[in-house]
Design a protein with these regions (language model features):
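N-terminal Rossmann-like NAD(P)+-binding domain of SDR-like oxidoreductases, especially those catalyzing
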Residues: 1-166
Length: 166
């Protein structure tokens, strides 16, 4: 039996590298890893060609343009555009190449600024987002909705999880 081929987009980041370490310990999977220089996730053709040639079975989507408050305030268009492109390119290419399992890493910033604590999943889209990272949050919400839409329309198993700082 061949090993499952798992692509980790963002394997050098904090969450992606933790996922990589856990999967490496299993030993029953083959990890497919590409650096930013090896695969430009903003290039839809490159992402599609990568998926078409690599026979990927599962995807962990941890890649994102991230930054602090100053970066988010200074480059809001870059944050929303680049994150939506990364998510759209990977999710669509995964679907086109019959990858049925995908895990999208969201962010706790998708919850409203004044959400009750502890936050409940039902708080999503129920209030105003924190203005300092709203474009990033909107891109992350778009990724969640992309996963939900591919599941509903195509019967995929694309899931979203929100991490926090606990």
């Amino acid at each position: 039996m061949s090993k499952q081929r798992i692509f980790i987009a963002g394997h050098r980041g904090m969450v992606g590298s933790a996922i990589r370490r856990q999967l490496e310990q299993r030993g029953d999977v083959e990890l497919v890893l590409r650096t930013r220089d090896e695969l430009n996730l903003l290039d839809s053709r490159a992402v599609h060609d990568f998926f078409a040639s690599e026979s990927i079975d599962q995807v962990y989507l941890a890649a994102a343009k991230v930054g602090g408050i100053v970066a988010n305030n200074t480059y809001p268009a870059d944050f929303i555009y680049q994150n939506m492109m990364i998510e759209s390119n990977i999710i669509h290419a995964a679907h086109q190449n019959d990858v049925n399992k995908l895990l999208f890493l969201g962010s706790s910033c998708i919850y409203p600024k004044l959400a009750k604590q502890p936050m409940a999943e039902s708080e999503l889209l129920q209030g105003t987002l924190e203005p300092t990272n709203e474009p990033y949050a909107i891109a992350k919400i778009a990724g969640i909705k992309l996963c939900e839409s591919y599941n509903r329309q195509y019967g995929r198993d694309y899931r979203s999880v929100m991490t926090d700082n606990w």
